């Protein structure tokens, strides 16, 4: 989801920077809320050297965003619009996670949600797919950040280890990007 919707994003940034002081933190945003972030969050972003990656959607006022970024001396980029989309889900759950994980382009985009961390978004967004398509992909898998004795080394080890969720992914299959219209099709998400 959109990270700037999270009222505790500043706390997350501070905690991650404290645990992993040399890790590059990137906020990937659609840009719609960027101009409304308040001074305390801007200060945290600057102090912890957070980079902001902004989707360059046509509805955004590029000039205002560029001015905002420059006025606040933020590290940011405007990413080009989408030309293709990839489907990768395998609802049968019969993929070999040890084969899929090393090829996964999402495995290096660490996500935080509800006190958990995972190498990708899938454990935290599967419920949307499950609800709409009446499927049972695993939900809420991830590293419990409140686990007793958990340290940065253990987190790092688990982030590079395939999850059970990986069995429900496949190799990416790209297709031309277009706005989806209801009713949505499983074929837009599933390879098998």
Feature annotation, model-predicted:
Residues 1-102:
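Conserved glycine-rich "GG(E/T)P / GGGxP" loop and the immediately following alpha-helix
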Residues 19-20, 48-51, 74-77, 132-134, ...:
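Short, surface-exposed linear patches
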């Amino acid at each position: 989801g959109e990270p700037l919707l999270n009222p505790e994003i500043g706390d997350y940034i501070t905690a991650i920077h404290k645990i992993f002081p040399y890790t590059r933190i990137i906020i990937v945003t659609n840009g719609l809320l960027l101009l409304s972030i308040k001074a305390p969050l801007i200060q945290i972003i600057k102090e912890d050297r957070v980079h902001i990656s902004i989707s360059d959607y046509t509805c955004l006022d590029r000039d205002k965003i560029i001015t905002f970024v420059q006025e606040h001396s933020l590290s940011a980029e405007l990413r080009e619009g989408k030309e293709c989309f990839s489907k990768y889900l395998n609802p049968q759950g019969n993929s070999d996670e040890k084969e899929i994980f090393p090829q996964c382009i999402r495995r290096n985009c660490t996500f935080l949600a509800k006190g958990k961390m995972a190498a990708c978004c899938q454990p935290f967004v599967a419920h949307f797919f499950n609800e709409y398509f009446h499927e049972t992909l695993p939900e809420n898998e991830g590293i419990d950040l409140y686990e007793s004795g958990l340290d940065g080394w253990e987190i790092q080890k688990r982030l590079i280890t395939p999850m059970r969720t990986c069995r429900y992914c496949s190799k990416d299959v790209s297709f031309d990007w277009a706005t989806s219209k209801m009713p949505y099709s499983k074929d837009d998400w599933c390879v098998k």
